């Protein structure tokens, strides 16, 4: 029978629930338990696909093509398991199913209400995700903060879940901020106390508290929290500041969090093997050979917009034992500022990041031109690959007004155009070419040397493609088409006689993990570092 760990959050959002949930998953998986994860997002969007990255951060794409919350990326990277569409439950999905059921007469004439119909649907979706994974333990992270009006049905649903499950099958872990005042050097616990009081009003008593803090909690602070939250001090843990999020599982393991959770769930506490994880962190900490990488994009003011790419760089860097220095460059700045262009002169490699729309496009093209002309290792991902084709068409083939029809529908040289299957699509959400797609790699190319296989799979998220009508012209001009889909779509492009120049329509960052880095990022960093 599946056991459940419910993660709630208090005081404020972005308090680290996702990292704590992923860390618990890692620690329990390393003890031999089969784990699955569920992220509950109380927003009314059906998925994260139509959200602005500045509002919500990266959209993480799963193998089955779901456009999900970035926390699912944390889960995959930490726990080392694949997530699917059913691992991300949103209020939009829940209400959509409830209304559909009502229209189909499945409620037999009942008045459809939040309780029981919405809460039953939430529980059903949690249990479905658990059953699909045949999990020993399902970790459910409730997005948002206790007290948010949109989160109330979800908290009520997990309260009911505990009531319905056998004793010892459900554990509540509450993650909340405790503020450290530098002026008085005091830790203030009152906001955490109030968040637990709010949780208890809903009918949920946390079994374990993880306090997010700048510094480790002392015993007196734990006793104070215990007094006001009805949680014993030995079940209060400190998630304090560390140099990198990958250290969080280790500090929680050192405090005994996983062991306490297992005791609450009446499960054996096996000895974990974290040696590979520790080695990965040590490699990052002890690396001293610096390599400067420019990341050129339109959402660089919020680094979470590209979190999987950032993490994929660190995964590959640990493998190569080098120290990456990330130089974030807003692509619009390159269009308007000589200083931004000058930044490119100091880097060892350039990544042109994915994105949509016209803003910052010319800046990205200038960055690609610089990389091509100056033999700087270049990696273009999704839109970055498409714009590399545009740059090549303009500046090598002499098609001065070449463009993507996404930006200029009337371009005389539409080297990038809408996929055939997208031309009749009206709805925006969930309609792109999504998920894991097979790529056939040409032997003797850079891509083949990187992957070492003729057939590879990468996750995709796009509507546009390299225009098939221009493929012959591009190849005659010197562009290498090193990877295609099963039906002939251009998937990978590269240049001969260049240190490293590779563009991919897919997103290799989504499959990169600390202990299994993406070969694309390994190849790129190896070229940038000269190792």
Swiss-Prot record:
Pathway: Pyrimidine metabolism; CTP biosynthesis via de novo pathway; CTP from UDP: step 2/2. L-glutamine binds at residues 54, 355, 383-386, 406, 463. Mg(2+) binds at residues 71, 141. It catalyses: UTP + L-glutamine + ATP + H2O = CTP + L-glutamate + ADP + phosphate + 2 H(+); L-glutamine + H2O = L-glutamate + NH4(+); UTP + NH4(+) + ATP = CTP + ADP + phosphate + 2 H(+). It is an enzyme of class 6 (ligase). The keyword Nuclease does not apply. CDD domains: CTPS_N (cd03113), GATase1_CTP_Synthase (cd01746). Residues 292-531 form the Glutamine amidotransferase type-1 domain. CTP binds at residues 13, 148-150, 188-193, 224. The active site is at 382 (nucleophile), 507, 509. ATP binds at residues 14-19, 71. Allosterically activated by GTP, when glutamine is the substrate; GTP has no effect on the reaction when ammonia is the substrate. The allosteric effector GTP functions by stabilizing the protein conformation that binds the tetrahedral intermediate(s) formed during glutamine hydrolysis. Inhibited by the product CTP, via allosteric rather than competitive inhibition. UTP binds at residues 13, 188-193, 224. GO terms for molecular function: ATP binding; CTP synthase activity; glutaminase activity; identical protein binding; metal ion binding. InterPro entries: Class_I_gatase-like (IPR029062), CTP_synthase (IPR004468), CTP_synthase_N (IPR017456), GATASE (IPR017926), GATase1_CTP_Synthase (IPR033828), P-loop_NTPase (IPR027417). CTPSs have evolved a hybrid strategy for distinguishing between UTP and CTP. The overlapping regions of the product feedback inhibitory and substrate sites recognize a common feature in both compounds, the triphosphate moiety. To differentiate isosteric substrate and product pyrimidine rings, an additional pocket far from the expected kinase/ligase catalytic site, specifically recognizes the cytosine and ribose portions of the product inhibitor. Belongs to the CTP synthase family. Homotetramer. This is CTP synthase.
